[in-house]
Swiss-Prot record:
Gene: rpl14
BP-aspect Gene Ontology terms: translation
Record note on quaternary structure: Part of the 50S ribosomal subunit.
SMART domains reported for this sequence: Ribosomal_L14
GO cellular component: chloroplast; cytosolic large ribosomal subunit
Protein name (record): Large ribosomal subunit protein uL14c
Species assigned in the record: Illicium oligandrum
Length: 122
């Protein structure tokens, strides 16, 4: 469960290393973001000499959460960290690589480009 002020790792090579959630996109009363939700975030830590810089406001999609994800078949998935992938206004990833495993639910939410870049889909 990601809420405003939550710090997240970045799971791509866009240039950001750590994000802080500012807002959850969607209904105005969304309190928490889960896997597949789009958030507005600020970059807290960035790689030097990259296009994205610290204190820049961006959009990102959640790909991993520490909170369990229960599937319809009864399987429960839990990750070790909270991670997101930086996206543009159209929903395409800004980076060219995605690191770590991501959930299969992103494919149903039309983030197919992120799924195709991921090394492992759980």
């Amino acid at each position: 469960m990601i809420q405003p002020q939550t710090h997240l790792n970045v799971a791509d090579n866009s240039g950001a290393r750590e994000l802080m959630c500012i807002r959850i996109i969607g209904a105005s009363n969304h309190r928490y973001a889960h896997i597949g939700d789009v958030i507005v975030a600020v970059i807290k830590e960035a790689v030097p000499n990259m296009p994205l810089e610290r204190s820049e406001v961006i959009r990102a999609v959640i790909v991993r959460t520490c909170k369990e994800l229960k599937r319809d078949n009864g399987m429960i998935i839990r990750y070790d960290d909270n991670a997101a992938v930086v996206i543009d206004q159209e929903g395409n990833p800004k980076g060219t690589r995605v690191f770590g495993a991501i959930a299969r639910e992103l494919r149903q939410l039309n983030f197919t480009k992120i799924v195709s870049l991921a090394p492992e889909v759980l």
